[in-house]
Curated annotation (Swiss-Prot):
The keyword Ribonucleoprotein applies. This is Large ribosomal subunit protein uL14. Part of the 50S ribosomal subunit. Forms a cluster with proteins L3 and L19. In the 70S ribosome, L14 and L19 interact and together make contacts with the 16S rRNA in bridges B5 and B8. Belongs to the universal ribosomal protein uL14 family. Keywords: Ribonucleoprotein, Ribosomal protein, RNA-binding, rRNA-binding.
Length: 122
């Protein structure tokens, strides 16, 4: 459950380390984002000479949450951290590598690039 002001780790090599959610996209009064949802973020920590700079506002897709995701068989997949992958204006990932596992819930036409770059799909 990601909401406004939530801090997330970045799971790609775009140059950002930590981002803060400033808006949950997809509805005028939408409060929470789960795995696979797109959020608007601002970069809070970035490495030098990265693709993104501190203070930049971007879209991101949530790939891991501490809340987890419930599957139809009743199992729940949870993670230790909240993480996101940064997206450009056309919805493609900015980074060329994804760090850590992602869930099968991202396996839609929109995020197949992220699933194919991830080292493990749970």
């Amino acid at each position: 459950m990601i909401q406004t002001e939530s801090m997330l780790d970045v799971a790609d090599n775009s140059g950002a380390k930590r981002v803060q959610c400033i808006k949950v996209l997809g509805g005028s009064h939408r409060r929470y984002a789960a795995i696979g949802d797109i959020i608007k973020v601002t970069v809070k920590e970035a490495i030098p000479r990265g693709r993104v700079k501190k203070g930049q506002v971007l879209n991101a897709v949530v790939v891991r949450t501490r809340k987890g995701v419930r599957r139809s068989d009743g199992s729940v997949i949870r993670f230790d951290v909240n993480s996101a992958v940064l997206l450009n204006a056309s919805g493609q990932p900015i980074g060329t590598r994804i760090f850590g596992p992602v869930t099968r819930e991202l396996r839609t036409e929109q995020f197949m690039k992220i699933v194919s770059l991830a080292p493990e799909v749970l």
